[in-house]
Amino acid sequence: MAIFEGSFTTASNLKVGIVVARFNDLITNKILSGCLDCLKRHGLDTSETSETLDIVWVPGSFELPIAAKTLLKKSNYDVLISLGAVIRGETSHYDVVISEASKGIAQVSYDYDVPIIFGVLTTDSMQQALERAGIKNNLGWNYALQAIEMGSLIKNLN
């Protein structure tokens, strides 16, 4: 019996794309920072001249799937990370954005056979979002670890 697992030891052999929603950038900037810190500590070149990391900014979480799809058409990535923050308001807009963003990201991942980490915070309040973006824990770090694991796993399986 073969057992396959992703590795957490290094990201230096991965090509990573990050798509970040600008809406709620107080939150998304913090998540991106945590994500980049983790990737750097695991050996990925995160400098502005990096050839193994690309970052794309989009207006909001709804636009994450199309940007991810365009990135995957452009280049061979081992893994993508989508980052956003959608905070519940008084209308149903929250539900629509989350539903379409999550379905879109999943569909792009399936269509291109590339893992895309769904790093979109969905919270009921700004306080909850801030807690997840660094006050208590920066989930950006976790999303990067998931990317390292899935990127290496899929490389090993192929």
UniProtKB/Swiss-Prot annotation:
The lineage of its organism: Bacteria, Bacillati, Cyanobacteriota, Cyanophyceae, Synechococcales. Belongs to the DMRL synthase family. 5-amino-6-(D-ribitylamino)uracil binds at residues 23, 61-63, 85-87, 118. Catalyzes the formation of 6,7-dimethyl-8-ribityllumazine by condensation of 5-amino-6-(D-ribitylamino)uracil with 3,4-dihydroxy-2-butanone 4-phosphate. This is the penultimate step in the biosynthesis of riboflavin. It holds the Pfam family DMRL_synthase. (2S)-2-hydroxy-3-oxobutyl phosphate binds at residues 90-91, 132. The active site is at 93 (proton donor). It catalyses: (2S)-2-hydroxy-3-oxobutyl phosphate + 5-amino-6-(D-ribitylamino)uracil = 6,7-dimethyl-8-(1-D-ribityl)lumazine + phosphate + 2 H2O + H(+). This is 6,7-dimethyl-8-ribityllumazine synthase. It comes from the Bacteria. It is an enzyme of class 2 (transferase). It comes from Prochlorococcus marinus (strain MIT 9515).
